[in-house]
């Protein structure tokens, strides 16, 4: 696990003390992997304190959302839509769409998310996949 991934896991453990992340391949997008919540994470009842902590700092980036996976697969099948272009992944989460766009030939991809841990996840996942992304926490500060 890379230093970025270790940092990401440590941040996750502030909310979910026993949670770990692992590099996982994605279905139907063979050459893309993400650091996601370990699939065997305990599914036992949580205390009210744990639930409150999760509500206050939801870690949306620990899952690959179906819409992101579908978009990544679509970009694989239709790279001409992003090849040679500048792309914004708004609400990037784990960065799956940003990474897929970069792999499909986008000149620059900006992963934008208000959650600093999501941006850390994007950085760790970009590193895992050997791509370079740009990052922004504020859409309004992006320049053309």
Q: Positions of the model-derived regions?
A:
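Short acidic/His/Gly/Ser-rich catalytic and metal-binding motifs that mark active-site loops
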Residues: 42-46, 98-100
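N-terminal auxiliary segments of SAM/dcSAM-dependent transferases
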Residues: 1-43
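Conserved SAM-binding loop and adjacent beta-strand
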Residues: 58-76
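Short SAM/SAH-binding signature in class I
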Residues: 144
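Conserved SAM/SAH cofactor-binding pocket of Class I
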Residues: 73-141
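Glycine/charged-rich beta-loop-alpha catalytic/anionic-binding loops adjacent to active sites
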Residues: 48-57
């Amino acid at each position: 696990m890379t230093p970025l991934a270790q940092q990401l896991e440590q941040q996750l453990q502030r909310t979910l003390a026993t949670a770990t992340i692992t590099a996982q391949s994605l279905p139907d997008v063979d050459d893309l992997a993400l650091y996601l919540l370990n699939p065997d994470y305990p599914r036992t009842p949580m205390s009210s304190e744990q639930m409150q902590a999760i509500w206050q700092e939801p870690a949306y980036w620990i899952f690959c959302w179906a819409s992101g996976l579908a978009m990544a697969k679509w970009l694989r099948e239709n790279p001409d839509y992003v090849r040679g272009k500048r792309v914004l992944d708004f609400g990037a989460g784990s960065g799956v769409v940003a990474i897929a766009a970069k792999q499909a030939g986008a000149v620059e991809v900006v992963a934008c998310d208000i959650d600093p841990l999501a941006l850390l996840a994007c950085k760790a996942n970009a590193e895992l996949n050997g791509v370079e992304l740009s990052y922004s926490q504020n859409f309004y500060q992006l320049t053309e």
